[in-house]
Regions:
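Bacterial N-terminal signal peptides that target proteins for export
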Residues: 2-12
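Bacterial N-terminal signal peptides
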Residues: 11-21
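Sec/Tat signal peptide C-region and signal peptidase I cleavage site
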Residues: 22-26
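Extracellular beta-rich ligand/substrate-recognition surface
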Residues: 27-29, 94-101
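Short linear S-[DN]-x-LW-Φ motif typified by the pepsin-like aspartic protease active-site region
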Residues: 27-85, 106-108, 126, 186, ...
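Extended Gly/Ser/Thr-rich low-complexity repeat segments
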Residues: 100-112
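Right-handed parallel beta-helix
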Residues: 116-159
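Short, surface-exposed interaction patches in beta-rich subdomains
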Residues: 146, 150-231
Length: 231
């Protein structure tokens, strides 16, 4: 998702790297959650056999939701919007899921709005190879390296990964607009790989009280690269 720094409306770009399905795999991990906040533009890329994506926001989606074709071959995408309990849900569904393709769905959001979606990730193995996070001063990117049969808002009976993106006032983050704070919660056995630069960036790991099976990693810095394990 790309959230422009100075525009009053935030344009969130969801890049779908859509591949053909190769069959489901059993899930043997707990729910994972990632929440991050930054005043810098953000880029979110999801790779895998994504067929359906549901985005839900705490405010009404602004007009202008559309699909941008990024490959020479067309990537037909259907968009529908529903409202439940004051939350808008945008369903992004591939029209043809038999061929790999890529498209960008552009969503306009008001300032300080939140966006969330739930991802079915049945192929993430018991070792918990969760993904990779990289950041620098201008944008943040989050990549899931495993395949996903679909992305769903509600996926009853399956293990899910939940992502929440929240745009915050710059005063709550840093006066320099270059500070990024990331909180990552991983299940037992999961790993998270990322980079840390400059050396002045800080990295803290702690086990939340009352739940020793989960490890929370807090990453602070303009750009960070490193590795963390739940141990």
């Amino acid at each position: 998702m790309h959230l422009t720094q100075k525009a009053p409306l935030k344009a969130a770009l969801l890049t779908l790297a859509l591949a053909a399905s190769h069959g489901a795999h059993a899930a043997t991990f707990q729910d994972e959650a990632i929440a991050f906040a930054t005043n810098n533009p953000m880029s979110l890329t999801v790779k895998g056999d994504d067929v359906t994506v549901n985005l839900t926001t705490n405010v009404s989606l602004l007009p202008g939701v559309h699909v941008e074709q990024k490959d020479e071959a067309p990537c037909p995408i259907g968009l529908t919007t529903t409202n439940e309990n004051g939350n808008d849900t945008l369903t992004i569904k591939r029209v043809d899921s038999t061929q790999p393709c890529k498209a960008v769905v552009v969503v306009n959001l008001p300032e300080k709005s939140t966006v969330g979606f739930t991802q079915r990730t049945p192929s993430i193995d018991a070792k918990g190879n969760f993904g990779k996070i990289t950041t620098h001063a201008e944008h943040m990117s989050l990549t899931f390296e495993g395949r996903a049969d679909s992305l769903e808002l509600r996926a009853a009976g399956v293990a899910t990964a939940r992502i929440r993106v929240q745009q915050l006032p710059i005063s709550l983050i840093s006066v320099s607009a270059r500070h990024v704070a990331t909180n990552i919660s991983l299940p037992a056995g999961a790993t998270a790989d990322y980079k840390i630069d400059p050396a002045s960036s800080t990295f803290d790991k702690a086990v939340p009280s009352g739940n020793p099976s989960d490890t929370t990693i807090r990453l602070t810095g303009s750009t960070v690269v490193g590795a963390a394990r739940n141990q």
